[in-house]
UniProtKB/Swiss-Prot annotation:
GO terms for molecular function: lipid binding. Belongs to the plant LTP family. It comes from Arabidopsis thaliana. This is Non-specific lipid-transfer protein 4. GO terms for biological process: lipid transport; response to abscisic acid; response to salt stress; response to water deprivation. It comes from the Eukaryota. Keywords: Disulfide bond, Lipid-binding, Signal, Transport. Plant non-specific lipid-transfer proteins transfer phospholipids as well as galactolipids across membranes. May play a role in wax or cutin deposition in the cell walls of expanding epidermal cells and certain secretory tissues. Disulfide bonds join C27-C74, C37-C51, C52-C94, C72-C108. Residues 1-23 form the signal peptide. The lineage of its organism: Eukaryota, Viridiplantae, Streptophyta, Embryophyta, Tracheophyta. It holds the Pfam family Tryp_alpha_amyl. InterPro entries: Bifun_inhib/LTP/seed_sf, Bifunc_inhib/LTP/seed_store, Plant_nsLTP.
Amino acid sequence: MAFALRFFTCFVLTVFIVASVDAAITCGTVASSLSPCLGYLSKGGVVPPPCCAGVKKLNGMAQTTPDRQQACRCLQSAAKGVNPSLASGLPGKCGVSIPYPISTSTNCATIK
């Protein structure tokens, strides 16, 4: 639990550093949409329904190239503190297809 709280605190601080001017999506939006996923992303198990609701909401909001790139940057920052395989598989577990892998090696600038 302490790890999850520490991770979430670091992620929220990153929100203010990474925000992009062109994108309507902020890292704060990403963080609030995916906060129900923290337990799953750190320990695994069953994906909670509120987590999938957040994944679907975020996917629906990322409709422009700047929004998708910003969401990628936010997810990439968050992926550093969670289990990488759980993070990359989360969209599929929620029935969502995204056009890029969630990985610290993804080049978010190439996302269209």
